[in-house]
Amino acid sequence: MTEGVGLPLWLLAELTYRCPLQCPYCSNPLDYAQHKNELTTQEWFDVFDQARQMGAVQLGFSGGEPLVRQDLEQLVAHAHQLGFYTNLITSGMGLTEQRISHLKQAGLDHIQISFQASDPVVNDALAGSKHAFEQKYEMCRLVKKYDYPMVLNFVIHRHNIDQIDKIIELCLELNADTVELAICQFYGWAFLNRQGLLPTQEQLIRAERITNEYREKLKAQNHPCKLIFVVPDYYEERPKACMNGWGKIFFTIAPDGMALPCHAARQLPISFPNVREQSLSKIWYESTGFNHFRGDAWMPEGCRSCPDKDRDFGGCRCQAYMLTGDASNADPVCGKSLYHQLIEQARAESEIDSSLGKLVFRNSRNSKQFTVQQNIPVQNIVDD
């Protein structure tokens, strides 16, 4: 199937699942600890070569924490030579002035640093790591020093959303150019912890109001900082156009070489190919995995005849699978879905008090335990 299939313009290279942090909202798979056979430097070079030949123009380096890879600078340099626009998506842990300097020399175009909270204590508690806030703060200053645009990302959830004003103030203190205030998206560990992370509707309305007030203040001051507020689809009545459609422009390569149409698709009961076994072109145009939800032939009636199908492409397949057990079902976010009550139930559960101590942190011990127990809830273990 090649007719009507677009180019894979955006390549996400998940270099590793290893990470020094333990964020309970991480989108990595719960069983990430069993996926250890990472692509080599040369194998990544080959992936980049093929993707560029196919028309890919933007390359994101992600993880896990991509800075764990000691060959990151080599990978960036190779991508730069090919003409990619390169973006490092990082927690800032493992970043040093020397590495920033080397990445700059290698041709890295963009660095996005994530924070957990504006308060150091809350930030480090959510990260499951001591001194994480201090490290991030210092790296932000160095990113500015090396003339990168300052792009900060905060995953917003019920434990930090009420400090949205302080979060924005921190970003202004750091001279951020762009701030993404993204309400938690519930995949991987975030889905496991959904009840403890989903903000209430009241919290969400307040946070968006405060963000809009800051936007007006910044506009009046002719301030360059741009605030982006990403709402959760759990409070919508129509689904998002996930990844702008399955297999339309987005290509993810997992650490072990599995090729995916989005970073959450690994959990689906679908066979996805590996770049060690097939070319990217064959994977993109011919593989069952990438063609599975292209077009509308797969859609159940109701979705197929819906006038919005060309806008939302049926919503998120991973979300449909996680909530209903069948990835072909209508995304339960949709108010027309037979499963919309599951979203309404999640909204109701957000009103139940939940402390940080009830969250399951993302670390290898919990991942291994989850893998062994296979869907039996894991204990809350925080690695020292």
UniProtKB/Swiss-Prot annotation:
Its EC number(s): 1.21.98.4
Disulphide bonds in the chain: none
PROSITE patterns with a match to the protein in the record: MOAA_NIFB_PQQE, RADICAL_SAM
Ligand binding ([4Fe-4S] cluster): 19, 23, 26
Chloroplast is among the record's keywords: no
Catalytic reaction list: [PQQ precursor protein] + S-adenosyl-L-methionine = E-Y cross-linked-[PQQ precursor protein] + 5'-deoxyadenosine + L-methionine + H(+)
Pathway assignment: Cofactor biosynthesis; pyrroloquinoline quinone biosynthesis
Cofactor needs: [4Fe-4S] cluster
A Pfam family the protein falls into: SPASM
GO MF annotations in UniProt: 4 iron, 4 sulfur cluster binding; cyclase activity; iron ion binding; oxidoreductase activity; S-adenosyl-L-methionine binding
Co-factor binding details: Binds 1 [4Fe-4S] cluster. The cluster is coordinated with 3 cysteines and an exchangeable S-adenosyl-L-methionine.
Keyword field: 4Fe-4S, Iron, Iron-sulfur, Metal-binding, Oxidoreductase, PQQ biosynthesis, S-adenosyl-L-methionine
Top-level EC class as recorded in UniProt: oxidoreductase
All copies of domain Radical SAM core, residue ranges: 5-220
Similarity comment text for this entry: Belongs to the radical SAM superfamily. PqqE family.
Role this protein plays: Catalyzes the cross-linking of a glutamate residue and a tyrosine residue in the PqqA protein as part of the biosynthesis of pyrroloquinoline quinone (PQQ).
Assembly information from the UniProt record: Interacts with PqqD. The interaction is necessary for activity of PqqE.
Protein name as catalogued: PqqA peptide cyclase
